[in-house]
């Protein structure tokens, strides 16, 4: 599998500078659980975490200010398993994301071992970009 430097693309995320930096630093230090961040349009995003072996009750999602934290604490098995090969990792984790201003968590679902967290960017109308009409009239000072 190839790794690509996405930093030039991350610079285009207006309003997501903090998230891009946090993702880069998290990716360098955090290998579990694997996750994707999907952008469906300019205002809708989805974080998907692969959590095979976890139950919904093992997971906790908290939003404190702009810090979104997902924690997983799997239930300990009653009996010790003797592995011949262990390819699936089921271990406690804590993963944090720093969200941009005006981002809201709109929901979370856990289906088939995938945790989906939906995000929406709601920029107040007063802060949203406004289109300025260009007039044919001469400027006032000319």
Curated annotation (Swiss-Prot):
CDD domains: ACD_IbpA-B_like. Pfam families: HSP20. GO terms for biological process: protein stabilization. The keyword Cell membrane does not apply. It is found in: Cytoplasm. Keywords: Chaperone, Cytoplasm, Stress response. Coiled coil: none annotated. Residues 26-137 form the sHSP domain. The N- and C-terminal flexible termini are involved in oligomerization and in the binding of non-native substrate proteins, and are essential for chaperone activity. Belongs to the small heat shock protein (HSP20) family. Homodimer. Forms homomultimers of about 100-150 subunits at optimal growth temperatures. Conformation changes to oligomers at high temperatures or high ionic concentrations. The decrease in size of the multimers is accompanied by an increase in chaperone activity. Associates with aggregated proteins, together with IbpA, to stabilize and protect them from irreversible denaturation and extensive proteolysis during heat shock and oxidative stress. Aggregated proteins bound to the IbpAB complex are more efficiently refolded and reactivated by the ATP-dependent chaperone systems ClpB and DnaK/DnaJ/GrpE. Its activity is ATP-independent. This is Small heat shock protein IbpB. The gene is ibpB.
């Amino acid at each position: 599998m190839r790794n690509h430097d996405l930093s030039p693309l991350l610079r285009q995320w207006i309003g997501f500078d903090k998230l891009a930096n946090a993702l880069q630093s998290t990716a360098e230090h955090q290998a579990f659980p694997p996750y994707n961040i999907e952008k469906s349009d300019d205002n809708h995003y989805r974080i998907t975490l692969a959590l095979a072996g976890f139950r919904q009750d093992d997971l906790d999602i908290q939003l404190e200010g702009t810090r979104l934290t997902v924690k997983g604490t799997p239930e300990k098995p009653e009996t010790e398993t003797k592995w011949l090969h262990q390819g699936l990792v089921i271990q406690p984790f804590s993963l944090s994301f720093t969200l941009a201003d005006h981002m809201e968590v709109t929901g979370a679902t856990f289906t088939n071992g995938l945790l989906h967290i939906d995000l929406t960017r709601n920029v107040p109308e007063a802060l949203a970009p406004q289109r300025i009409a260009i007039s044919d009239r001469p400027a006032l000072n000319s």
